[in-house]
C-alpha cells in the first residue's frame, strides 16, 4: 500500500474542499489513488449531505452584524440545539450576517452564491453550508434575513436564539434598552396604530365571542369588546408597554424614550424556529412498526 503523504492530502483537499481528516481517510481507503479517493470523497460527502437535506431544521441561531448605520440580522437553522452551539456553525452564521450587510443580496439564493471560504470548504457560502452538512451530518439552512441601511442601529441577542435590531434617532443606550425590552416582551409594532388589521380583527372576534356569553345587552357587549381590543393594543404595542427596566414599574417605553430624547423608527424581532413545525418522534410507534415489519418478513 502506498504511503499517504501530507502533499497528497493537501492536493485532495484542494480539489474537493473536504476536511483534511476526510481526505486522509479517503486516500487510505483508495490505497493512495488520488482519482479514486476524490470519487469516494465526493460520493461520501454528497450522500451524507443529501440525506440530511430533507430533514426539518427548527433549531439554530440568530446572528447580527452592525457597522455604523449599516447592518443585518439572519436566522440560520439546524436540526438540533447541539449543532447550533457548534463553533463552525456559529462562524458560518456570523459570516452570513456580515455578507448580507456588506453585499445586500436579494434573497437566500443570492446570499448562498456569495464568495466565502471556511473550514476547508468554498468558494461560496453554499459550498460551506454543504460541506458542514457533510462533516457534521445535520441539515442546515439559511431561513431569513433583513438588511438595514441609512439609520442608527442598536442590536440585542439573547442566547443567540432571540435577536432584535432597533432603528432609531437619539441615544444609543436607550435604543439598546429598547432592543432588550423587545426581546423580553415581544411587541408586534412600535405604536398601536401600526398593529396589523388582521391581528386586531382576530382579537375582536375572540372578544366578541367571550362577551356574548355574558348575556348582557348588546350595547354593553359592544363596550366590552371595544375595551378588550384597546387593552390588547396596549399590550402588543411597544410604546404603550411598561418598560422592563422601569424603576417604578409603571413607566412606559414611550415615556422612557421621551426622557431620553430618542425616537424609535422601527424594530425587527427574530426568534429561532418561529413558525416552523417540529417533528416529534414517537419512539414507541417506531419500535412497534419495526417489530411488525420483522414479523411480516419472517
UniProtKB/Swiss-Prot annotation:
Q: Name one GO molecular function term.
A: translation elongation factor activity
Question: Protein biosynthesis as a keyword?
Answer: yes
Q: Which controlled-vocabulary keywords does the entry list?
A: Cytoplasm, Elongation factor, Protein biosynthesis
Query: Where does this chain mainly localize?
Result: cytoplasm
Which Gene Ontology cellular-component terms appear in the entry? cytoplasm
Q: Which family does it belong to?
A: Belongs to the EF-Ts family.
State the function annotated in the UniProt record.
Associates with the EF-Tu.GDP complex and induces the exchange of GDP to GTP. It remains bound to the aminoacyl-tRNA.EF-Tu.GTP complex up to the GTP hydrolysis stage on the ribosome.
Which NCBIfam families does the record match to this protein?
Answer: tsf (TIGR00116)
Report the protein name in the record.
Elongation factor Ts
Source organism of the structure: Delftia acidovorans (strain DSM 14801 / SPH-1)
Highest classification ranks of the organism: Bacteria, Pseudomonadati, Pseudomonadota, Betaproteobacteria, Burkholderiales
Amino acid at each position: 500500500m502506498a504511503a499517504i503523504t501530507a502533499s497528497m492530502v493537501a492536493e485532495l483537499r484542494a480539489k474537493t474542499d473536504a476536511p483534511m481528516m476526510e481526505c486522509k481517510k479517503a486516500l487510505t481507503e483508495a490505497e493512495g489513488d488520488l482519482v479514486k479517493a476524490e470519487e469516494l470523497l465526493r460520493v461520501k460527502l454528497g450522500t451524507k449531505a443529501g440525506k440530511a437535506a430533507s430533514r426539518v431544521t427548527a433549531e439554530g441561531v440568530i446572528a447580527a452584524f452592525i457597522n455604523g448605520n449599516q447592518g443585518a440580522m439572519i436566522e440560520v437553522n439546524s436540526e438540533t440545539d447541539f449543532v447550533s452551539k457548534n463553533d463552525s456553525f456559529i462562524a458560518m452564521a456570523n459570516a452570513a450576517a456580515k455578507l448580507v450587510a456588506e453585499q445586500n443580496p436579494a434573497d437566500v439564493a443570492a446570499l448562498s452564491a456569495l464568495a466565502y471560504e471556511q473550514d476547508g470548504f468554498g468558494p461560496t457560502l453554499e459550498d460551506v453550508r454543504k460541506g458542514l452538512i457533510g462533516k457534521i451530518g445535520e441539515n442546515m439552512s439559511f431561513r431569513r434575513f433583513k438588511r438595514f441601511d441609512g439609520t442608527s442601529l442598536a442590536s440585542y441577542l439573547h442566547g443567540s436564539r432571540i435577536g432584535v435590531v432597533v432603528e432609531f434617532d437619539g441615544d444609543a443606550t436607550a435604543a439598546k434598552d429598547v432592543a432588550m425590552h423587545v426581546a423580553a416582551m415581544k411587541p408586534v409594532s412600535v405604536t398601536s396604530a401600526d398593529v396589523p388589521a388582521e391581528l386586531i380583527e382576530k382579537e375582536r372576534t375572540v372578544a366578541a365571542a367571550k362577551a356574548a356569553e355574558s348575556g348582557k345587552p348588546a350595547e354593553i357587549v359592544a363596550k366590552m369588546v371595544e375595551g378588550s381590543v384597546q387593552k390588547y393594543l396596549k399590550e402588543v404595542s411597544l410604546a404603550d408597554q411598561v418598560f422592563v427596566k422601569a424603576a417604578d414599574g409603571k413607566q412606559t417605553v414611550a415615556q422612557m424614550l421621551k426622557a431620553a430624547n430618542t425616537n424609535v423608527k422601527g424594530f425587527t424581532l427574530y426568534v429561532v424556529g418561529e413558525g416552523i413545525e417540529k417533528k416529534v418522534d414517537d419512539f414507541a410507534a417506531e419500535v412497534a412498526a419495526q417489530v411488525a415489519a420483522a414479523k411480516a418478513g419472517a
